[in-house]
Each structure stands twice: as structure tokens, then as C-alpha cells.
Swiss-Prot record:
This is Probable transglycosylase IsaA. Gene3D superfamilies: 1.10.530.10. Is able to cleave peptidoglycan. Residues 1-29 form the signal peptide. Keywords: Glycosidase, Hydrolase, Secreted, Signal.
């Protein structure tokens, strides 16, 4: 899935790679004597700092590849954005700052997700898709939802998928909802650079995951072959 970011103040300058045109020149990190290791650390571990302030004063357009990821940092001097994506083009994380309101839409046919921002406020919005964290967890359940101790949930789509999985496998819907919450936080388009994707984070060998139905089918195949051990149970 390729993601694009569009902000009202960057609509002309920002394209599918997330670059903003500031001086007409896209500067590689080496050209600006940028500490790539520091920027990589910020993108993965300190996203709040990237959202709070630009990495330097004035306009800039920095992009570089490191350890299998493409990193982009742009600013027009007023608003700024940053992103990083796996080498295969799957966006791992991005943010466009100085936008208070945003809407998201997903085109299932073209596998493109767009985020439109209203850049009239200093508030920031962040959307990120990252590899799932595996740990011991506890769940609280209602008739239609599961919430893990870390706050992850299966979401509306994930809860529906869990019900279908229960019908097709005989395993309780709450168990499947917990798996979905842990693996993807209910994000249909969740992607792990390892290749796992979808609500259930199944590997490509179990089948395509472009749609929720395909994700359910892939999860059923994985379950029939490996049982719940496919998800570490």
C-alpha cells in the first residue's frame, strides 16, 4: 500500500513520496551535513519531537535511505512534514504538522490511502503503521469489543472479522478479537516490513490481504495449518 500526504499549504508541493518543494532542490542528507542516525532515531523512537518542531529553521527538503528505509523531512518554513517507508514502498510512518483537522479515506481498488489536513492550527496529527509488539497482555471484553492492556483494540472492522473467524474456526470471537488487537490494532492496512500484513498480520504465503475477506481467508488457512500457534499461542 502506498500512502500519500496532502496538506492545504503543501498541496502543490507534496507528492506521493511526501516531498515538499521549497527551493527547487531536493537535498540529500549528505549535502546538508545532516546527522542521519539522529533523524532515524527521531523517526522511530521520538515521533513527538518531530511533530512538535521542525528539525531545523527555515525551509528544507531532506531525504535519504538507511538500513532499508527511505526517510523524508520537509518544510516550507511554516509547516513541516516527515515520513519513513520501507524499501519496498510500504509507508511505515508519517506526519504532516500544523494541521488540526484531517480526514482519511482508503480506496480498496487502488490500494491508496490519502490523508487531507486543514493547516489552520498548530495541533498535529500522526498516523503510523508499525510492526506489532509481542508481549504478555490482559484483555477486557464486552459483547462486541476487546481492549488490551496497552490500549489496542480490534476496532469495528476487526470485531466483525473476529465474528466471522469464530464461525469458520470454532475459536471464540473474543480470542480472534484479541489476536487482531495485538497484531494490528484493528488496522486493515497494517503492514510489517517482515511481510506480514492485514488485521491478522499473516505472511504472503497464506494468500493476498488486499481486502478484509482475503485477510480472513488467509487467517483461516494459517489456522487450519498451524492452529493458534501461528499467532504464538
Amino acid at each position: 500500500m502506498k500512502k500519500t500526504i496532502m496538506a492545504s499549504s503543501l498541496a502543490v508541493a507534496l507528492g506521493v513520496t511526501g516531498y515538499a518543494a521549497s527551493t527547487g532542490h531536493e537535498a540529500h542528507a549528505a549535502e546538508m551535513n545532516v546527522d542521519q542516525a539522529h533523524l532515524v532515531d527521531l523517526a522511530h523512537n521520538h515521533q513527538d519531537q518531530l511533530n512538535a518542531a521542525p528539525i531545523k529553521d527555515g525551509a528544507y527538503d531532506i531525504h535519504f535511505v538507511k538500513d532499508g528505509f527511505q526517510y523524508n523531512f520537509t518544510s516550507n518554513g511554516t509547516t513541516w512534514s516527515w515520513s519513513y517507508e520501507a524499501a519496498n514502498g510500504q509507508t511505515a510512518g508519517f506526519s504532516n504538522v500544523a494541521g488540526a483537522d484531517y480526514t482519511t479515506s482508503y480506496n480498496q481498488g487502488s490500494n491508496v490511502q490519502s490523508v487531507s489536513y486543514n493547516a489552520q492550527s498548530s495541533n498535529s496529527n500522526v498516523e503510523a503503521v508499525s510492526a506489532p509488539t509481542y508481549h504478555n497482555y490482559s484483555t477486557s471484553t464486552t459483547s462486541s469489543s476487546v481492549r488490551l492492556s496497552n490500549g489496542n483494540t480490534a476496532g469495528a472492522t476487526g470485531s466483525s472479522a473476529a465474528q466471522i473467524m469464530a464461525q469458520r474456526t470454532g475459536v471464540s470471537a473474543s480470542t480472534w478479537a484479541a489476536i487482531i488487537a495485538r497484531e494490528s490494532n484493528g488496522q486493515v492496512n497494517a503492514y510489517n516490513p517482515s511481510g506480514a500484513s492485514g488485521l491478522f498480520q499473516t505472511m504472503p504465503g497464506w494468500g493476498p490481504t488486499n481486502t478484509v475477506d482475503q485477510q480472513i481467508n488467509a487467517a483461516v488457512k494459517a489456522y487450519k495449518a498451524q492452529g493458534l500457534s501461528a499467532w504464538g499461542f
